[in-house]
Each structure stands twice: as C-alpha cells, then as structure tokens.
Amino acid sequence: MKFTKKQIERYSRQIILKKIGVIGQKKLLKSSVLIVGAGGLGSPIAIYLAALGIGKIGIIDKDNIEISNLSRQIIFSTNDIKKNKASTAIDKLRKINPDIQFKSFNKKLTKKNINQIAKNFDLIVDGSDNFRTRFLINDYCLQNKKILVSGAISKFDGHVYTFNFSKKKISLFKMLYT
C-alpha cells in the first residue's frame, strides 16, 4: 500500500511518531472498528478514530438524538435532534475524513444480529449504556477472539478496559461487575 500525497499530509503528525511511523499508519488504514453506542463515549471516540485514519468505522445505535444529549455527545448539533444517532454520526465523520469506509447500523445490538454486524470488524468499542449489551459484546468478543475496548461513565466516575481475546481464552469482564 502506498500513501497518496494527501494521506502523507493528513497523517504526517502520526507518521513522525516513532511508535506509529509509516508501518503503524498503514496498519491503522487497514484496520476496522465497530463502535457500539454513539453517545457520550461513542461520539468522541468516533471523531478521533476517523481523524486517526482507521480504514473502516461502523457505528450501531438505535436511539434518536434528543436535546439532552447535546451537552455531552459532541458529534451532534441542534439541527440533528430527532435523527438517528448512528447514521447522523456517520454523516459527520464523512466530513472529517471522506477517505475511509463507514457503515451505520440503525438498530439495537442483539444476540440474533451481533455476528452479522460485528464479524467484519477487527476491534469492538463498547460505549453502550447497559449491562445486557456489555455482556453480549463481551461474550461475542471472547468467542470470536476479537479485541474489546469497553468503557462506561456514571456521573463523575468512569472506567475503560481493554480485553485482547485474540490472545486470552478467559474473560474477567463479568467478574468486574458481579
């Protein structure tokens, strides 16, 4: 894979970093991330991943944007109220980086659809707001040897964990919450 002149210019600040360089940037451009939830965590994560040059970004969220979301879901604006979060976020991300692939899923993540949705992504970012979905994503990533980055915020507290199930065969995720 060769960089275009535009890509070299766009990603130059990352390429000059020793821990990223040309090889690392090529890996980013070939990678894919599914973001579950386009809310307070998912929306800024999506912005940064698009700017970083992740080659393919998917977002799944069934919710519509409400005015109460605007104080913390920074990808959305007043004009977006009542629109679907996933598809609206993708529209905004295309403006940030039109050269990468995007896919929106305007639905709830369930046991029935998780494999079809998540199978074509290297890494799953869990920004969901409920334990049922978190456990579903964890179980899927464990069974399919996917990398999971899980985060949650409650009032003024938050956490983020990375589980590399491509290397480990056990999950400590449920132990954190039971």
For each predicted feature, which ranges?
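Adenine nucleotide-associated cytosolic modules
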Residues: 1-178
